[in-house]
Amino acid sequence: MARTSKRARRSSPLHIPSAFELFTPSKELVLKNIWIFGPLYAVPFIFWIHSWIWSPLPTQHVHWWGHADTLSAGWTGSPLPTYGTFLVVGFSLLWFILIAVAGTIVQIMTQAAQLDAIERRPLTFDSLWDTVKRLGWRLVGLYIVMGLVIGVGFLLLIVPGLIMLRRYFLAPYVMLDKNTGIREAMDKSAELTKLNTGAIWGVLGVMLLFGLVNIIPIIGGLASFVLGSLYSLAPAMRYHQLKRMS
């Protein structure tokens, strides 16, 4: 019987695998290049640990270090002395600046590494840093514009925000790959994601699913982080697949 389905065969370069099918190849590339992705993913993990340590206990509205006097004689009954509280405020401000700067740099390097890994290009920190110097400010502008557009969409109604998220999901990879401007990257992302909207929704759905693992007590946060890290190349893979279709 003649083949009547319009879907591409699995052996075809135009075949789009399901979002879950991307987990294994993504995991393999992450582990193969762990000397690059390991340090890059360690940075947000450190940020997460810091956030967890300084978050209030859910039932008592104090930080965990408020009970540290039971752990060491070096701690007083009060969480911190008055001068220490001011140090914490200053430290928090410095930490915010550190997160803004280091987090953005790591974000750019990570997305560049993801794209290079998919394209089978050699990964080095020198080349990733060159990408930051070459496209850093442009990508920062793209992140800001994307954040504003998607944020306004969610403020108006949830649905427009989701649509904007889907449309511009691949914009950073377009800019990294094609060296485009902000508007061109967003327009190209909208064009690519329109080729197969389900392929983008699928990846977003799996990412959300892994994020929900965080609600599991005790181990949920770590499990969510590990699963998300192993699946992190899926967006770059989708970009590569849809680019071949265009």
Features from the language model and the residues they span:
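Hydrophobic alpha-helical membrane segments
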Residues: 2-246
